[in-house]
Regions:
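In a subset of proteins, long, contiguous C-terminal domains/tails are tracked
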Residues: 1, 5-8, 404-412
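Bacterial Sec-dependent N-terminal signal peptides
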Residues: 1-24
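Non-catalytic cap/lid and distal C-terminal segments of serine-dependent acyl enzymes
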Residues: 19-411
Length: 412
């Protein structure tokens, strides 16, 4: 009963999750006047769906440039959703920024070179950042994702705003060979100061090839050669992506790899937690101190608080419940229950956790409590915005059958 029913719920959640970009709430479009630019900018604010169901968690910010290029923009959103769904990166607040063709070049060129990039930086990192902090729990970690002109801007903004921009994904960039001495000096200032900072920094840049009509290859190669001659600080991770593709294809090949690389350590805590349980000898308690210390270590690395996610709770609870090495014996379900109850506290929106808790109480013959958690699971399922109505009906039928089994046992 337990394996069949719980597996059904997990599969339902998984397949529903894969149908659309489900890690995020519906986007909110707005137009904001930027006094620094004496112009208006179209923004799209997208928040992670998990935000409304958890507490004590802050979320990194991603500025995703070139919303006006809908194909690349949507692809990048789906890439972020994909990695978030797999817990390969933390849930983030996304700010999509659109540029008019008439202003894109000027706004991405430094003021000292006749542009307004410094004014755009002021708008984004003073006005918009303040707005986000007043409305959402924002973590001290910011990523910029740009292509071509906005990639140039992203790279410049990282060195100009130090220490505000932690990561840059710059696809098919030009002028990385520093077209002017001022930009070069700004970057070298960033390089020299970065070791004093808290947390880690990342710079990813890429190009296609001239043969494939990406004419930024030479400038990107020049920048890569320049970096090879520098003493790169340990706090700065550099990634150079080069593929035999054109100017418009390279962003799709860059963003996925860059984000996976930037947040590679984010997933380590969950993975190392499985090693803890595999080496666990005591069968009377959950070693929370060991688990949490892994998350504290990754938090120190990135410079913002990272907490156990659903992947952690489900993986650890499954390991206890299944007791693969026969270590926990009759305590296995007790330990699994402790983990799941902690999960319910942290993520009260996940209906399947309530149902799993209900099944454990059922096995322990605590029928009233089992019914209580099953009913809570139904209530959460009813409010779920992702699972379709037909799927909810099917899952509800399974839950009702399960609850009928509980009532039958209570009559014996």
């Amino acid at each position: 009963m337990k394996i069949v029913f719980f597996s059904f719920c997990i599969l339902q959640s998984y397949f529903s999750f894969c149908q659309s970009t489900t890690s995020f709430n519906a986007p909110v479009d707005t137009v904001v006047y930027a006094k620094q630019l004496d112009d208006s900018i179209s923004l799209q604010i997208i928040t992670p769906s998990i935000m409304q169901y958890s507490s004590g968690v802050s979320y990194p910010v991603i500025f995703l440039f070139d919303k006006q290029n809908e194909i690349n923009y949507q692809y990048n959103l789906e890439t972020i959703d994909y990695l978030t769904s797999l817990s390969a990166m933390p849930p983030c607040i996304i700010v999509g920024v659109a540029f008019e063709n008439s202003t894109r070049n000027k706004w991405t060129t430094p003021n000292i070179s006749g542009g307004k990039a410094d004014d755009l930086i002021s708008f984004l990192f003073e006005d918009i950042s303040l707005l986000l902090k007043t409305k959402f729990p924002v973590a001290n970690f910011t990523t910029l994702i740009g292509h071509s002109r906005t990639a140039i801007f992203s790279s410049y903004a990282q060195s100009k705003t130090y220490p505000l921009v932690n990561a840059v994904v710059a696809s098919s960039t030009a002028n990385f060979d520093f077209g002017d001495e001022n930009t070069k000096k700004q970057f070298e200032f960033f390089i020299n100061e970065i070791e004093k900072s808290r947390g880690q920094y990342f710079l990813t840049f890429s190009s296609g090839t001239s043969f494939q009509l990406d004419y930024h290859e030479a400038s990107v190669d020049s920048f890569a050669n320049y970096l090879n001659d520098l003493q790169i600080p340990g706090k700065l991770t550099i990634m150079h992506v080069k593929e035999p593709v054109d100017h418009f294809v390279i962003p799709g090949l860059t963003v996925n790899r860059a984000l996976a690389n930037i947040f590679a350590s984010y997933r380590k805590a969950a993975i190392y937690s499985l090693e803890v349980i595999q080496g666990q000898q005591q069968n009377d308690s959950v070693p929370w101190r060991q688990y949490l210390s892994l998350y504290e270590e990754q938090s120190a690395y990135y410079g913002f608080k990272i907490v156990p996610d659903l992947l952690f709770y489900n993986s650890i609870a499954s390991s206890y419940a299944n007791d693969y090495d026969d270590v926990f014996k009759d305590k296995s379900s007790v330990l699994a229950l402790e983990v799941l109850l902690k999960c319910v506290e942290s993520y009260p929106f996940d209906y399947s956790t309530y149902l799993w808790v209900s099944e454990i109480y059922f096995e322990q013959k605590k029928y009233t409590t089992a019914i209580e958690f099953a009913e809570k699971g139904i209530a959460v399922l009813t409010d779920d915005k992702v699972i379709t109505a037909d799927e909810k009906l099917e899952i509800n039928d399974e839950i009702n059958d399960f609850m009928e089994s509980i009532h039958q046992e209570m009559k014996k």
